[in-house]
Amino acid sequence: MLKLSMSRRAATGLAMTAAMTLSGAAFAPAFAETATSAVWQGLHKDIFGGREVLDAKDMISMDAPIRAEDAAVVPITIKMPASFAANVKSLTLVVDQNPSPVVAAIKYGAAAGTGDRMLSTRIRMDQYSDVRAIAETNDGKLYMISKFVKASGGCSAPAAKDAEEAAKSLGKMQIKKFVSKEGDALTAEAQFMIKHPNTTGMQMDQVTGLYTPARYVNKIEVKSGADVIFSMEGGISISEDPNFRFTHGGKASDVIEVKAEDSDGASFAGQLAPSQS
């Protein structure tokens, strides 16, 4: 399935190159937007089996830059109102033109909360592309919102940190919690960052001229007390030092716990007790 998606995007890339040559670079952004929409047709089938995807413009909002300052660190924030979020069981983030289009597949748990829902992270972008958020509700329906973002080169951009320095801090976590009360309901936000190079396999070592092997965080589970807030499966499209900020439920006295694994099989864990908030 992934091979099928890659071949479709390769064909689209050749068409884009030809069009830019004939029509001029001034038309490239508009053509890129059209091309990425065409790529989505194949991804839609590969990822969701061609199931109907409904317009979520009144139920999901996405905050992302029109033009990113750094294609290796593109901030995106997804928000859903409580009335809709209560029925959402999963969220999939997709960048059409990335070598690995599925950025993250997120499953919500019992501690996801009953209020407005928010998830913020940072992603890599290889080319100008639509960025999509697709929510699945408990009745199996899919709802999508998308935004076209101008950014390129993020998947092959050199790491921000020296490899030896990154190795020393590999897996270390920083976790923060933000709590506020609204009436009788507790609304909370938390944030964590995992020190990890999240290499893509497309980055060249400037000294050796060789490509750095891919190594990335591919599994994350976040809990409030004994209950899961969300679990995630990810890939190379998540930025270096994966960073997530999110809303959640649970009790103010709960410990926030984060467990993660990477593609080399290494495991990492961290937690934040209420006294540390």
What function would you assign to each model-found segment?
Residues 20-29:
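C-terminal segment of classical bacterial N-terminal signal peptides
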Residues 33-161, 176-185, 191-277:
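A general "mature secreted/periplasmic domain" signal
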Residues 17-21, 137:
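Short stretches within intrinsically disordered, low-complexity N-terminal or propeptide regions
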Residues 163-165:
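N-terminal helix-cap/turn-to-beta initiation motif at the start of protein domains
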Residues 8-10, 26, 227:
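Intrinsically disordered, low-complexity serine/threonine-rich segments
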Residues 1-18:
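N-terminal secretory signal peptides and thylakoid transit peptides that target proteins
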Residues 169-175:
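Terminal interaction module
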Residues 167-169, 204:
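Non-catalytic macromolecular-recognition regions in eukaryotic signaling proteins
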